[in-house]
Amino acid sequence: MSRTALPLLFASLGLAACASVPTANQDSGREIPAEMAQRIERISKSHVFADMHAHPSRFHRAGVETVLPEEIENYRRSHMAVVVANISTDMAFSGRYTNRDGTEVERGRYKPAPGEVMALTVDRMQRLDDTIEAGYAVRADVPQDALDARANGEVALLSALEGADALEGSMENFYELHRRGLRLIQPIHFRNNELGHMQTWPYSPGGLTEFGKAVVREANRLGVIIDMAHANSETMRDILALTEDPVLFSHGGVRALTDDDRVVTDEEIRLIAENGGVIGIWPNGSRVETLDLMVDYIEHVIRVGGIDHVGIGSDLRGVSRYSTGFGGNANFRAVAAELLARGYSDDDVGKVMGGNFFRVWSTVAGQ
């Protein structure tokens, strides 16, 4: 789809659809000087820029049929070739989402019936399919799709689960979701489930379950990326001991710089680096107030684990506000510009902006 066609699409969607998507702090972030913007664009042509964790247009919860084209355009403006589009499948337990018929499911809802979490997940995966069918984005099934998207000025959506609650303890559900395009699985979100234990309060001790271990093995066999975000330390250690592939911790902060529960310790940074994996730093304005602080977090991971083991996971539309300078319009270029201003080379900036993620994906996919 040409960029000139996008304004017509925006108008055709109408204001109602846009109003259904939270747009807090919808600023464009830090302004990028023209010369710096040109340099970043050159870097994007030799590295795959990727958002390791996002909920574009809040497609998993909001009353939208697709990811909205203006959201895709925000990514395109920052030269992002890949967006990992996450479905928080534990929302079937917590509520706070909108059904196809427009009804709102409130917080603290009833326990889902058997098959209900899987059905909700399939419906949200269909929203990604519909986004692609509408021509707003392309599909990211294999790493070559990202290279093609970059070459064509497009954005590729990679289908992901945030919390593997959709499996409902069934490996057959995993196989079915993989058949439908699932390429990344995050075992845990905001509840303990059939796979393991969560990171956030109230902290629950315990690691991977036997089913969780089986899912890790099958993910390795199928070429599905494993994301350890939201898993507690025991579950992370169990995954790292078992997996044969590099893994992600797609979005969060670092313990050394904040007393928070959505962080990795220096020991965990080193273990993930030894595994060949990548830690994604997020621009969550409630916890990482400014873009400068976000880049401080990135630099800490570089010092502890190395330049090859850090990336960006925006959690776009999954948080209420964004780091000042990054902005609600997801100005990834501002991160690249700050790294360049701090003296990082073009190659190193390309790694942080998505090259490291692309390496992990290529390894996991066997390409």
Residues of each region from the PLM?
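Bacterial N-terminal signal peptides
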Residues: 7-16
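N-terminal hydrophobic targeting/anchoring segments and the immediately downstream early-domain regions
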Residues: 19-203, 259-312, 316-367
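Divalent metal-binding pocket/active-site signature
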Residues: 165-168, 179-263
